[in-house]
């Protein structure tokens, strides 16, 4: 264990301007506060785990200080303890800290034995990651040999999370050619090691030097670059943080720009330190002159859920059927969404507040009915939001502190006094979820959600979009086991004319089925309702509430797996259908869809990105059909197909995260986001977690000229997909965002084509270069670009920095295809020298019809390798009769094999022989 001394790690936070983040982290005088480490409810109780987390973080603060030139340190952290663990005197109730906004999740390994620390990164270079994942065994120090000290590995992950930097190693392609010479992928290039391969046969193993492949110019499969235990290089933390000497990130001076790794691929060849230096945190801090204190810790234990509904019943709620819709959505929340064991109260407000019901615990259906009957029946008066909030605080404090409680605030009106209670809200420790109903809801409403970490949603007056019910359906608990949460399977609406039918199907898959509820609403008269289960049996027993204009059916036990069919008939009116359920089994993770946007405010012409993360437990669901419905305050709805293709807005292919740019703004104000996901004949579940941004697995190290091998890294097959069909249906609220600076129609074209991020190149036929990429659009990843500009150079930096001066390829015959189509282009390099050992670099720029240009693409690379001539062996006397070998020579370039290198972002080498 020579290279692994007791070390510490860096915790540095990159707060993106305008970015949507649930994180509670704040930077205060060089110290980071409010970081949440959550222990998963399924982790067995182990009090030593808490101390191990503390030790890791305490070590980290010093390393943070050193690595950033005394600029940052780790000030405090909250450790979130499961409700199922024993209570202790020093465990207190959380305030705003929840599992949903945790920065670090400590959970059992998936699959078992895979303890690799990793970070979810959905965005591009410089964009904040989602969450760090660690296992109890990793934190306990049981993986020191494989990943080095826990603190150092955690720094590596935190840089992914807060700064949006990427790995500087490459598990798929560990070596590359540079000017005809083999180089190990590393940063900095001064790190030393030996290229060896471990061979095992018959229970015994031995080590030998890697064999040079005279055809490809690279080493054989299985070759490892094993590091010397003693190094002098100080960088880089994103390559090999476990090495004692490494205490820095790569800078522009020592960064290895040619290495085919994700950092170069995603960040346009920039060093990690350059990316970090561009962060807002770095720009607003200066180095410290004194030693900071050790970090402090708070131990927070999840308790019973406490919720108070604060509902607007002012005069404006009488218009547009709003009060009735509030009752429908409120009943869904009370009858289905809120979990058993929760404490729920209700306050209404107009010009003043009115307590409808004190806190009661939901232990039975009768408790739910009691609250549902207290929903407001009449609307009148003005709007005083602060009165409602203050009354809710009073209701909660009669039984519990407000810390960690939740308030669901719905309003449709303006209130210019809302800022008067902001300080009280901050001091309360309560989480406020806001629902803005209609076009005139108070503009300051979202501030309440932002300052408390609550959800912000918007529902228009377009009843058929079912926005209000979706908003309340999204308010399941942010804590506790996922098996207890309400999951929305369907949400649909339609305006019928002349006794038309609203027909459709809902899939109940094997991961859900408990507490399944069918909810139907109407605007005029009760419709005819027909429902059949998968066996064709007609279902009856709907509870009809003519006053609220809704009917619902709770399926007893576990609903049958399969396709449920419904038919609704009515005269001219609007109907909606909502179906919710829960996990069928506490030990079988349900398929979930989590949707969001990359920011909650968007200033035109800045594009917005919509994400949908589809998982069963930790396993991603691939090849689903995913669409986002984005509705503006004008009532206009845009439908986006979200893709998991690794192009455009989508950062990584086949990781279960579906993404797309939104550019179709039509007005200023609020927009709601809703995602529909369907799994059919093509959908599949990946057995293992896809390769994420994670710390380097150490194959071994060299100590006193001897190689000490670690056990082989757990195999993670990127193609390990279960081909059994995954049929399911889900809907998910993606919250809302607010757009500004949108010009009046006609809206000008200010959006360029999207950046090409998956350009690959290979030599074809000895003299031609074949390019492939995913087509961008006229506006990012929508429409069709007008033309492409392709340039080449023998210098990677010249092509990046002097693209317009580099040699241009004739693309007259290249007509762009529609966005997200595969493009193929074959050309012959001209007016450039291409000889043995030469690397040729290629990049593309897309141009739209108004001459707006995309960013330069990733840089692809082809390398020409001519194997050395091998003299014929002199035959031994007893081999004189041996026949001569039959030699085949490439007909295009005699005596030369061509090495074709397809390099995605100079990152993912794929080698083949022409």
UniProtKB/Swiss-Prot annotation:
* GO molecular function terms attached to this record: chloride channel activity; intracellularly calcium-gated chloride channel activity; metal ion binding; metalloendopeptidase activity
Which residues does the UniProt record annotate as the domain VWFA? 306-475
Residues annotated as glycosylated: 503, 585, 770, 804, 810, 831, 836, 890
**Per the annotation, which location comes first and is thus the protein's main one?**
secreted
Q: Which InterPro entries match?
A: CLCA_chordata, CLCA_N, CLCR, Ig-like_fold, VWF_A, vWFA_dom_sf
Please indicate which residues carry the site annotation Cleavage.
Answer: 694-695
Residue ranges, annotated region (Metalloprotease domain): 46-199
Induction of expression? By IL13/interleukin-13 in tracheobronchial epithelial cells. Up-regulated by histamine in a dose-dependent manner. Significantly down-regulated in colorectal cancer. Significantly up-regulated in the IL9-responsive mucus-producing epithelium of asthmatic patients. Significantly decreased in nasal polyp. Significantly increased by TNF in upper airway mucosa.
User: What is this protein's record name?
Assistant: Calcium-activated chloride channel regulator 1
Per the UniProt record, the source organism is: Homo sapiens
């Amino acid at each position: 264990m020579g290279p692994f001394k007791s070390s510490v790690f860096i915790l540095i936070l990159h707060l993106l301007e305008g970015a949507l983040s649930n994180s509670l982290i704040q930077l205060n005088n060089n110290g980071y506060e409010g970081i949440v480490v959550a222990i998963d409810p399924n982790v067995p109780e182990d009090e030593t785990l808490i101390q191990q987390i503390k030790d890791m973080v305490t070590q980290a603060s010093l390393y943070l200080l050193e690595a950033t030139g005394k600029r940052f340190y780790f000030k405090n952290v909250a450790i979130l303890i499961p409700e199922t663990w024993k209570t202790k005197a020093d465990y207190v109730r959380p305030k705003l800290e929840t599992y949903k906004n945790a920065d670090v999740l400590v959970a059992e390994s998936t699959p078992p034995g895979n303890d690799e620390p990793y970070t979810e990164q959905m965005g591009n270079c410089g964009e904040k990651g989602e969450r760090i994942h660690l296992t109890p065994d990793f934190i306990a120090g049981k993986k020191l040999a494989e990943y080095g000290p826990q603190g150092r590995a955690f720094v590596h992950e935190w840089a992914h999370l807060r700064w949006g930097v990427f790995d500087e190693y490459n598990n798929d392609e560990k070596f590359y050619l540079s000017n005809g010479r083999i180089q190990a992928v590393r940063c900095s290039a001064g790190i030393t090691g030996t290229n060896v391969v471990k061979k095992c046969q018959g229970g015994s193993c031995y080590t030998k030097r890697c064999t040079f492949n005279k055809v490809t110019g690279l080493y054989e499969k299985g070759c490892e670059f094993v590091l010397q235990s003693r190094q002098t290089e100080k960088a880089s933390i994103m390559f090999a943080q476990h090495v004692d000497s490494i205490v820095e990130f790569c800078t522009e001076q020592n960064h290895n720009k040619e290495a085919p790794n994700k950092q170069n691929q995603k960040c346009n060849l920039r060093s990690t330190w350059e990316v970090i230096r561009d962060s807002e945190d770095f720009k607003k801090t200066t180095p410290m002159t004194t030693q900071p204190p050790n970090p402090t810790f708070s131990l927070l234990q999840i308790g019973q859920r406490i919720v108070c509904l604060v509902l607007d019943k002012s005069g404006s709620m009488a218009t547009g059927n709003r009060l009735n819709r509030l009752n429908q959505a409120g009943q869904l929340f009370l009858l289905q969404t809120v979990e058993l064991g929760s404490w729920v109260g209700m306050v209404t407000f107009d010009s003043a507040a009115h307590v409808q019901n004190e806190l009661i615990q939901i232990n039975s259906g009768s408790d739910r009915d009691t609250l549902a009957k207290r929903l407001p029946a009449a609307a009148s008066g003005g709007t005083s939001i602060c009165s409602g909030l203050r009354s809710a605080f009073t209701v909660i404090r009669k039984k519990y502190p407000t810390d960690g409680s939740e308030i669901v605030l719905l309003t449709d009106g303006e209130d210019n006094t809302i800022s008067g209670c902001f300080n009280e809200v901050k001091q309360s420790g309560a989480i406020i979820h806001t629902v803005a109903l209609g076009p005139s809801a108070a503009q300051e409403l979202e501030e309440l959600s932002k300052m408390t970490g609550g959800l912000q949603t918007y529902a228009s007056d377009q009843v058929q979009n079912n926005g209000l019910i979706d908003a309340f359906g999204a308010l399941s608990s942010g804590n506790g086991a996922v098996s207890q949460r309400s999951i929305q399977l369907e949400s649909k609406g339609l305006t019928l004319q002349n006794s038309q039918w609203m027909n459709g199907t809902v899939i109940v898959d094997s991961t859900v089925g408990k507490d399944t509820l069918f909810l139907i609403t109407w605007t005029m008269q009760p419709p005819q309702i027909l429902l059949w289960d998968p066996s064709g049996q007609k279902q009856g027993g709907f509870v009809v509430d003519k006053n609220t204009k809704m009917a619902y059916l709770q399926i007893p036990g576990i609903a049958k797996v399969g396709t449920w069919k419904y038919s609704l008939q009515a005269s001219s009116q609007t109907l909606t259908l909502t179906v919710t359920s829960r996990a069928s089994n506490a030990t079988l993770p349900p398929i979930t869809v989590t949707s969001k946007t990359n920011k909650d405010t968007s200033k035109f012409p800045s594009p917005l990105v919509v994400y949908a993360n589809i998982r069963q437990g930790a396993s991603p669901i691939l090849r689903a059909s995913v669409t986002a419905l984005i509705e503006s305050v004008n009532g206009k709805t845009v439908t986006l197909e979200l893709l998991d293709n690794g192009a455009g807005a989508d950062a990584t292919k086949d990781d279960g995260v579906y993404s797309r740019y939104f550019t179709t703004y039509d007005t200023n104000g609020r927009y709601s986001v809703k995602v529909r996901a369907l799994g059919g004949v093509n959908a599949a579940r990946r057995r293992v977690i896809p390769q994420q941004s994670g710390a380097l697995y150490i194959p071994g190290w060299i100590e006193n000229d001897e190689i000490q091998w670690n056990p082989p890294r757990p195999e993670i097959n990127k193609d390990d997909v279960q081909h059994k069909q995954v049929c399911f249906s889900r809907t998910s609220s993606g919250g809302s965002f607010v757009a500004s600076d949108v010009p009046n129609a006609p809206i000008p074209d200010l959006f360029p084509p999207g950046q090409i991020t998956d350009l690959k190149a290979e030599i074809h036929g000895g003299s031609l270069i074949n390019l492939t990429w995913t087509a961008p659009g006229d506006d990012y990843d929508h429409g069709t670009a007008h033309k492409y500009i392709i340039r080449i150079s023998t210098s990677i930096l010249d092509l990046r920095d002097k693209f317009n001066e580099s040699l241009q390829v004739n693309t007259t015959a290249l007509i762009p295809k529609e966005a997200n189509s595969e493009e193929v282009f074959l050309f012959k390099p001209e007016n450039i020298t291409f000889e043995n050992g030469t690397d040729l670099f290629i990049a593309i720029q897309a141009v739209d019809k108004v001459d707006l240009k995309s960013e330069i693409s990733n840089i692809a690379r082809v390398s020409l390798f001519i194997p050395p001539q091998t003299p014929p062996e002199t035959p031994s006397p007893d081999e004189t009769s041996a026949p001569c070998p039959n030699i085949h020579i490439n007909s295009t370039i005699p005596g030369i094999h061509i090495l074709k290198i397809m390099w995605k972002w100079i990152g993912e080498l794929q080698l083949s022989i022409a």
